[in-house]
UniProtKB/Swiss-Prot annotation:
Residue numbers bearing the Phosphoserine modification: S11
One BP term from GO: leaf development
Catalytic activity: oxaloacetate + phosphate = phosphoenolpyruvate + hydrogencarbonate
Regulation: By light-reversible phosphorylation.
Subunit architecture: Homotetramer.
Keywords: Allosteric enzyme, Carbon dioxide fixation, Cytoplasm, Lyase, Magnesium, Phosphoprotein, Photosynthesis
Protein name: Phosphoenolpyruvate carboxylase
Keyword Cytoplasm appears in the UniProt entry: yes
Subcellular location: Cytoplasm
InterPro entries: PEP_COase (IPR021135), PEP_COase_bac/pln-type (IPR022805), PEP_COase_Lys_AS (IPR018129), PEPCASE_His_AS (IPR033129), Pyrv/PenolPyrv_kinase-like_dom (IPR015813)
């Protein structure tokens, strides 16, 4: 590195202050946090790899910071020259360093948000740092409803205790950070929070600083790259770890805060322990849509594993409860039951397994006697599940275990009633109430597993059956004939098929899945979701297959409408379904419908998908009301804006009126799980946001759009869809350009999910899953699926009548939450974007004849951004959100570095003849440092590319995902 660069180089701290020159508020410590973490990291980097390599990292950081200041493309070339001169080992170290920096920046950001939140609460100020755009506090919401909107406290309480939010954790392959690193990140976050506590002593500070450095080094020394793809069982275990670490204790803690908030508006009751405020479901091990790795055996395994984990978590708490409930006074009901348990118990059977209360509990401790029996049965429940999981059988009789939640709750409720009857309500409302709330929330399996399968797979099974019965081909029948036959069979009792049914592997897989559902306890399962559902027969087919496979407690069947045409046809399909008497009797006045944000966005673009999802919900609710059915909408949202992501509070409050009505299901996917539940305070905040926003939407619904707004949206949606499809599906150059200009083809090397990136191995954009589609554009910071179509729609309506239509669009933005949220999220994406990165990728990776096409797309990007600001009435991006603007400025430099790293690495991978000017190894200050860089190359001995290239590429992908705070 040139001496003059060394001389003029400022510290990282100074660089950060140059990027974000002023504090946003008095309690703004983000730059301080960032600088501390980066300074500690650079010291570690120097110790491990030498001073020269540290200075190279600083030089690269400075070049990218200079680029961010003036956006001069020449700086990107200078950056590329430095990056391509590195040898294989150094290249991995530098890419890994910037990826690590972005993870540290995320942690600093989380600590700052948490700190500001605590400071606001101490002052009694509930205003959120994002102008209330991402927050929804339960106490603030209750006070607003009662004191501003004049709702009665009882009315609010009744609505709250009857509402349900079901959070569905999915294993979508967007969590690019390994669990090993997530745990280290949590410890770094914890150290950073404590370091800035007001009451910290000098000794504490020194020890915390040492711990911080230790964890930063441990994270940097951990291989970021998964060397093998996770299995569905791995994904399920990773998902379950959040329950163990935060959610399990987070739920009762949150419900206590709800009790306090209710008390503050004059309600002296607690939320009933069995009120279904928060529920949890999962797709991990149940989502077989396009994932051949999710087999019936996998589904069985994850159900048994969840049951074993649940029993173990209850078991670990029951002795604490036995210590707490040492009272001798009880009511007659409990006394009779305790005496009966005492007489019949044989403590010697399981006493050897216990550390505490291993002798028979005397009758003068009746609560302990009753809870002792609960402990015995929990132990047997856990062990039976463990045996079934490992051996397929168990010697423990099922009657010795808990088989239903009601059975589990019975002795606990008995203890609660007795304590209240004896004047000990304060004790009853302690740990026992928390335990009751956990049992009511988590049941015997922590989560209920949804099953998801493509509608065509059910059609194939029924086609095989009808052909075997020699009554024709189900596949070739009309919808009317299918319905007639299905209803005839559902009304009859004859079995449709026996062991002689010819079965392909695919047909056996579908039927065996139903057999697993029949075999396992019903409380293991939630919904059966049919993807690519288009007609009533899709739903009736699943009902018939459940009956034929002897499912005694049939799962509720949920059609999933994803593509634009399916969303448009969904209300009519639902009306036809509700017109079927058999089905209407079967559902008992309740229906769930899932709407997909990802595929609708890929099919038509974000603008048209958002509007069609809005209209479809309105129409579906109208249909349900007409037939007297309570409808629950299940929102299949991803983390990125292109897949329906965005702040929770706003996403809920911008839904159409009457579409939530106290009942909401929503997916929590991939990296969003960590963002929602990675820490106790994040978990608490997530539960608050969902609960408060759902309550507010029901009791203070958003306005309905004016007829002229609807007409404007309809007009713009047609234009936006045409623009989007004309480029993505009809432009002959697009597929080639997309695959050359982005790392889409290399996405699978990240090993971040168990399912393939495509539904079918060949084909174009339509066969590509939504996640890699969004991932590829997020990596290049061009975000095409999010904004494409907006510009054309705005331009056409403004060209028609600029003054009138601009006035109407601005009125829509200022008065209609849905429209404002839609535009604000696109504005946020523009704040993260940089078309010059796309131009660099084009120059390096795209054939020259496609360069004009890339220029055309970038012109559309700039025009769309300009029109969006005009409609929003903003002079510059994020002018109304200084906090987000500051956070993005601080992370842009390392992201840009990784963008350039990625472009040049892709060039070297795709063009082996590409020549680079290499310089001597940098990390040579000591033999040990040199050796450690070489060892990084050895982590991937089977790569088909030149040493170090594949790992460098994957590290850039992971780092950019961390920096953008989204993968796909």
């Amino acid at each position: 590195m040139a001496n003059r660069n060394l001389e003029k180089m400022a510290s990282i701290d100074a660089q950060l202050r140059q990027l974000a020159p002023s504090k946003v508020s008095e309690d703004d410590k983000l730059i301080e946090y960032d600088a501390l973490l980066l300074d500690r990291f650079l010291d570690i980097l120097q110790n491990l790899h030498g001073e020269d390599l540290k200075e190279t990292v600083q030089e690269v950081y400075e070049l990218s910071a200079e680029y961010e200041g003036k956006h001069d493309p020449k700086k990107l070339e200078e950056l590329g020259n430095v990056i391509t001169s590195l040898d294989a080992g150094d290249s991995i170290v530098v890419a890994k360093s910037f990826s690590h920096m972005l993870n540290l920046a995320n942690l600093a950001e989380e600590v700052q948000i948490s700190r500001r939140r605590r400071n606001k609460l101490k002052k009694g100020d509930f205003a959120d740092e994002n102008n209330a755009t991402t927050e929804s506090d339960i106490e603030e919401t209750l006070k607003k409803l009662v004191f501003e909107l004049k709702k009665s406290p009882q009315e609010v309480f009744d609505a709250l205790k009857n509402q349900t939010v079901d959070l569905v954790l999915t294993a979508h392959p967007t969590q690019s950070v390994r669990r090993s690193l997530l745990q280290k990140h949590a410890r770094i976050r914890n150290c950073l929070s404590k370091l800035y506590a007001k009451d910290i002593t000098p000794d504490d500070k020194q020890e915390l600083d040492e711990a911080l450095q230790r964890e930063i080094q441990a994270a940097f020394r951990t291989d970021e790259i998964r060397r093998t793809p996770p299995t569905p069982q791995d994904e399920m275990r990773a998902g379950m770890s959040y329950f163990h670490e935060t959610i399990w204790n987070g739920v009762p803690s949150f419900l206590r805060r709800v009790d306090t908030a209710l008390n503050n508006i004059g309600i002296k009751e607690r939320v009933p322990y069995n009120a279904p405020l928060i529920q949890f479901s999962s797709w991990m091990g149940g989502d077989r849509d396009g994932n051949p790795r999710v087999t019936p055996e996998v589904t069985r395994d994850v159900c048994l594993l969840a049951r074993m984990m649940a029993a173990n978590m209850y078991y670990s708490q029951i002795e604490d409860l036995m210590f707490e409930l040492s009272m001798w006074r009880c009511n007659d009901e409990l006394r009779v039951h305790a005496d009966e348990v005492h007489r019949s118990s044989n403590k010697d059977e399981v006493a050897k397994h216990y550390i505490e209360f291993w002798k028979k509990v005397p009758t003068n401790e009746p609560y302990r006697v009753v809870l002792g029996e609960v402990r015995d049965r929990l132990y047997q429940t856990r062990e039976r599940s463990r045996h079934l999981l490992s051996n397929g059988y168990s010697d423990i009789p099922e009657e010795n275990t808990f088989t239903s939640v009601e059975e589990f709750l019975q002795p606990l409720e008995l203890c609660y009633r007795s304590l209240c009857a004896c004047g000990d309500r304060a004790i009853a409302d302690g740990s026992l109430l928390d335990f009751l709330r956990q049992v009511s929330t988590f049941g015997l399996s922590i989560v209920r597993l949804d099953i998801r399968q493509e509608s065509d797979r059910h059609t194939d099974v029924l086609d095989a059956i009808t052909k075997h019965l020699e009554i024709g081909s189900y596949q070739e029948w009309s919808e009317e004939k299918r319905q007639e036959w299905l209803l005839s069979e559902l009304s009859g009792k004859r079995p449709l098929f026996g062991p002689d049914l010819p079965q392909t592997e695919e047909i056996r897989d579908v039927l065996d899945t139903f057999h697993v559902i029949a075999e396992l306890p019903p409380d293991n399962f939630g919904a059966y979701i049919i993807s690519m559902a288009t007609a009533p027969s899709d739903v009736l087919a699943v009902e018939l297959l459940q009956r034929e496979c002897h499912v005694k407690h049939p799962l509720r069947v949920v059609p999933l409408f994803e593509k634009l045409a399916d969303l448009e046809a969904a209300p009519a399909a639902l009306a036809r379904l509700f017109s079927v008497d058999w089905y209407k009797n079967r559902i008992d006045g309740k229906q769930e419908v899932m709407i997909g944000y990802s595929d609708s966005g890929k099919d038509a673009g974000r603008f048209s998908a958002a509007w069609q999802l809005y209209k479809a919900q309105e129409e579906l609710v109208k249909v349900a009301k007409k037939f007297g059915i309570k409808l629950t909408m299940f929102h299949g949202r991803g983390g990125t804006v292109g897949r329906g992501g965005g702040p929770t509070h706003l996403a809920i409050l911008s839904q159409p009126p009457d579409t939530i009505h106290g009942s909401l299901r929503v997916t929590v996917q991939g990296e969003v799980i960590e963002q929602c539940f990675g820490e106790q305070h994040l978990c608490f905040r997530t539960l608050q946001r969902f609960t408060a926003a759902t309550l507010e939407h029901g009791m203070n619904p958003p306005i309905s759009p004016k007829p002229e707004w609807r007409a404007m949206m309809d007009q713009m949606a047609v234009i936006a869809t045409e623009e989007y499809r004309s480029i993505v599906f009809k432009e002959p150059r697009f597929v080639e350009y997309f695959r050359l200009a982005t790392p889409e083809l290399e996405y699978g090397r990240m090993n971040i999910g168990s399912r393939p990136a495509k539904r079918r191995p060949s084909g174009g954009i339509e066969t590509l899953r939504a996640i890699p589609w969004i991932f590829a554009w997020t990596q290049t910071r061009f975000h095409l699926p999010v904004w494409l179509g907006f510009g054309a729609a705005f331009k056409q309506v403004l060209d028609k009548n600029a003054k009138k239509n601009l006035s109407m669009l601005q009125e829509m933005y200022n008065q209609w939450p849905f429209f404002r949220v839609t535009l604000d999220l696109v504005e946020m994406v523009f704040a993260k974007g940089d078309p010059k990165i796309g131009a660099l990728n084009d120059r390096l990776l795209v054939s020259k004849d496609l360069w004009p096409f890339g220029d055309q797309l970038r012109n559309k990007y700039e025009e769309t951004k300009k029109l969006l600001l005009q409609v929003a009435g903003h002079k510059e991006i994020l002018e109304g959100d200084p906090y987000l603007k500051q956070r993005l400025r601080l992370r842009h430099s390392p992201i840009t570095t990784l963008n350039v790293f990625q472009a040049y690495t892709l060039k070297r991978i795709r063009d082996p003849n590409y020549k680079v000017k290499a310089r001597p190894r940098i990390s040579k200050e000591s033999a040990e440092a040199s050796k450690s860089a070489d060892e990084l190359i050895k982590l991937n001995p089977t790569s088909e590319y030149a040493p170090g290239l594949e790992d460098t590429l994957i590290l850039t992908m992971k780092g950019i995902a961390a920096g953008m705070q989204n993968t796909g």
